[in-house]
Amino acid sequence: MRLRIAILLGIMLLAGGVSAQQQPVYSQYMMNPFLINPAIAGYQGYTDFNLIGREQWLGYSEGPSTYALSGQTRILRTSYRNRSRVIRSRSRRRRPSGRVGVGGLIYTDNNGAMSRTGFQGTYAYHIYARDIQYSAGISLSAFQFKANVSGDDLYDGRDPSLDGIRPGYSPDANVGFLVSGDFFYAGLSATNLFQNAIQFGGGTAETAYRLLRHYNVIAGYKYQERRSDYGFEPSIMLAFTERLSWTLDINFKAYYKEDYWAGISYRTAGAVVTMFGMNYQNFYFGYAFDYGFGDIPTIAKLGSHEIMIGMRLGDSARRYRWLNRF
């Protein structure tokens, strides 16, 4: 009986590579790329707090869901409230060399019979060369994998061999790199560096599953004519595992006065995402809807909803002139 459960859990964890959702899935990562790349921490200069909630397969009670709370900033010796005054008084001075960003993330990802809850702390370092910023970041994390099974789901509840199914606790690490300028960015990140073996039941070989390393490549270009209220941002994200299973997102976003935006994304995994959002003072809001199509389970065509709320403090437009950095 334990072997039967091991086989079922293994299919849930590993089948389909990227699509197996060993990692949380987000649609609005373009608004908060810190979710997928630790090098993002502090790269734009402002302080950002972000809350995101995602419900997949609307109408199905056991559909996947993801919730995440993140924060990231640049470490400075002056508070964000005083930066504009410092910038105005010393704007002609050359920017210093050292840059440090920090961040944190708490998340829970429920994938039906499996759930993953964890947190991470991030350190990033940024340097400049000829108006190009080079960033590197590392996140140290801890997470818990848990099997959400009951007697009615998988087995005869009287079977004592299943009493050993228990959560597994594991440390892990992520790394990321980013190159960015005034109008472009490109980055690479890797997660599950430790490739932890998640164990269920008695912890034998038949109930152990090793997590795959996941890689994300992002790139985008921001275009806006001078004195124009409109801007555009095409971008891509390539996600793949060490087994070379992959999916590609092709994205396009349009802005109006930096206060309103809308976008569309095509995923080769079989989904089209529409999204829109707005900024109001220090706050921003975003919504995305995923519609599945093609050779995917019928249940996945019910669609997914994702809501994002965030707050940004500070002035990112003048980040290159900030002084008194660490």
Locations of regions flagged by a protein language model:
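Sec/Tat signal peptide C-region and signal peptidase I cleavage site
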Residues: 16-20
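Subset of outer-membrane beta-barrel
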Residues: 21-326
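Sec-dependent N-terminal signal peptides
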Residues: 4-14
